[in-house]
Design a protein with these regions (language model features):
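Noncatalytic alpha-helical scaffold of FAD-dependent oxidoreductases
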Residues: 1-182
């Protein structure tokens, strides 16, 4: 069963897991940082797991994100990496452009803030190659300008091959092709 630890009215959510050699002291230190962040309005709300069960409930949200994210008939999954300092700006610009496509029904970004790896699940109500290409172009277009990557974790594959030049030079692509032949 999915338990929501916080109200679902925020624009962004962040999960932090910390592991140290002194669990009690580490927990208190994280709690202090969260309190300071709340006091300075850096964050709006927070919840800390106090038991293993609560921790597993929070992780279940992340693990089931694909199921939760797409309420549309068709969806597209993306796995890009972008500079950490630009995560908010790039995600917001992608969302803004995607919202202009009437066939897009859900836009769900999530990922790993610490390494700039962002996933998008974008739901649409029709399976139209023109719309698919338009969505691909919107998601991949910031990568070249900001030195991002087309695939952070899951490889290029056939679906991303035509967009590889958005994050790799001709020389890099040629080298990748030569390595693949080996």
């Amino acid at each position: 069963e999915l338990v929501k630890p916080l109200p679902d009215n925020s624009e962004y959510y962040v999960s932090i897991e910390s592991l140290g050699s002194q669990p009690k002291e580490d927990y208190e230190l994280l709690e202090l940082h969260i309190e300071k962040s709340l006091d300075k309005n850096i964050i709006e709300d927070a919840v800390m797991a106090k038991t293993e069960k609560e921790l597993q409930q929070i992780w279940k949200i992340r693990e089931d994100v694909a199921i939760l994210a797409s309420k549309a008939k068709f969806d597209q999954h993306f796995d890009i990496s972008i500079p950490i300092s630009l995560i908010g700006k790039i995600i917001n610009s992608i969302i803004l452009e995607l919202e202009s496509i009437s066939e897009v029904k859900t836009i769900f970004p999530f990922g790993h803030i610490a390494d700039g790896n962002i996933h998008f699940i974008i739901g649409r109500d029709i399976d139209d190659p023109v719309i698919i290409d338009k969505i691909n172009s919107i998601v991949y277009s910031p990568l070249k300008k900001h030195k991002g990557s087309l695939s952070a974790e899951h490889g290029i594959g056939l679906h991303k091959k035509e967009y590889l030049q958005t994050s790799r030079s001709k020389e890099e692509i040629k080298l990748m092709e030569q390595i693949k032949i080996m």
